[in-house]
């Protein structure tokens, strides 16, 4: 029997505890029917919960445990309790991304089931068939650049910097993702090259990397503001792989996340290397936040469960089991078992139970 897969779980704040519990439930369901698949879960603090307990948003023991794990499963961080002071929950998330060199954030945007089309804010005839992955550069750019706070002089600034190797690295990730399909998916590179020097370097490097290393692929460049309009008007036009910088990726992926009808549906992966052997180290989390105002047992766990499916496929070399989770989610949604954000009346735990049972049936 192979050694158990070590997964560090960082529930975080508010609904983070609930959604990670449901993902773990589904993973344990796999072990129930596949004796050769075992998981070793190790919980640690991050975010506001870590600040309350230790004074810092990412304790050293949580970071060190994550470095030794096969993968990390994260819930959500933040909330109004911790405000915008000098020590904030989000700092823990930025630190773990940087320390683990999680340079590529993958955010799929598609419909887990066509039965959800009517829930999209976009008319079904335009939303149907939407299927793209945002590949966001995660450890560079303006979020990690030099900055100056307002120290009383009424001036504050942030700086955006990218290097050729950073852009090459994220371009290779986008190309790898495109080449997993036959025919290869188109690549869209989003920037602001008509204004920003960093975007001009970005565009030039993306173009040269694709041309020199992946000559069979095609990349099209789109200004970020234009892409934001296209995403609302005709989202399928951007089907394929979308590559963009840290801040632009943060914004465009949040815009995209409402297309399927709920933030509670979309997973994400943050990877430290190409998943060419399905064993890339990664951190997996839902695209939504900590939802501090949501009552207990009401949050949609699907995004976190699907994040666990991505983890199985990209980091733990368990693609069949990952696909089983995705198929189980579709069956559960088609059966009308849904939380309130999808027009249903089921609780968080009921949805998790249903997915876990479907996974067992599929893999039995």
Swiss-Prot record:
Gene3D superfamilies per record: Isopropylmalate Dehydrogenase
GO cellular component, one term: cytosol
Residues flagged as site, Important for catalysis: 143, 192
Pathway: Amino-acid biosynthesis; L-leucine biosynthesis; L-leucine from 3-methyl-2-oxobutanoate: step 3/4
Keyword RNA-binding: no
Matches recorded under PANTHER family: 3-ISOPROPYLMALATE DEHYDROGENASE (PTHR42979:SF1)
Protein name, as recorded: 3-isopropylmalate dehydrogenase
Organism per entry: Saccharomyces cerevisiae (strain ATCC 204508 / S288c)
Gene: LEU2
């Amino acid at each position: 029997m192979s050694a158990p897969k070590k997964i560090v779980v960082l529930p975080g704040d508010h609904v983070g505890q609930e959604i990670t519990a449901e993902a773990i439930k589904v993973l344990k369901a796999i072990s129930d029917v596949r004796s050769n698949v075992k998981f070793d879960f190790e919980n640690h603090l991050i975010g506001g919960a870590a600040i309350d307990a230790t004074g810092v948003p990412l304790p050293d023991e949580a970071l060190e445990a994550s470095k030794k794990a096969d993968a990390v499963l994260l819930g959500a961080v933040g909330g109004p309790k911790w405000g915008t002071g000098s020590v904030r929950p989000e700092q823990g998330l930025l630190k773990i991304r940087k320390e683990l060199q999680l340079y590529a954030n993958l955010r799929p945007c598609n419909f887990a089931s066509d039965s959800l089309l009517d829930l999209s804010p976009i008319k079904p005839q335009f939303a149907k068939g939407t299927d793209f992955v945002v590949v966001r550069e995660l450890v560079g750019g303006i979020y990690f650049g030099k900055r100056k706070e307002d120290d009383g002089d009424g001036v504050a600034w942030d700086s955006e910097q990218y290097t050729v190797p950073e852009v090459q690295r994220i371009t290779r990730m986008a190309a790898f993702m495109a080449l997993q399909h036959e025919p290869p998916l188109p690549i869209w590179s989003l920037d602001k090259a008509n204004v920003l020097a960093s975007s001009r370097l970005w565009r030039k490097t993306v173009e040269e990397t694709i041309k020199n290393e992946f000559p069979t692929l095609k990349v099209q460049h789109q200004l970020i503001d234009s892409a934001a309009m296209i995403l609302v008007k005709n989202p399928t036009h951007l089907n394929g792989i979308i590559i963009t910088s840290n801040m632009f990726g943060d914004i465009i992926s949040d815009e995209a996340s409402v297309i399927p009808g709920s933030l509670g549906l979309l997973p994400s992966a943050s990877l430290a290397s190409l998943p060419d052997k399905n064993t890339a180290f990664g951190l997996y989390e839902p695209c939504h936040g900590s939802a501090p105002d949501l009552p207990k047992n009401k949050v949609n766990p699907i995004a976190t469960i699907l994040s666990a499916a991505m983890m199985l496929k990209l980091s733990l070399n368990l693609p069949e089991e990952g696909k089983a989770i995705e198929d189980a989610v579709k069956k559960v949604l088609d059966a009308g078992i849904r939380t309130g954000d999808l027009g249903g009346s089921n609780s968080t735990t009921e949805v998790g139970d249903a997915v876990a049972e479907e996974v067992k049936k599929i893999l039995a």
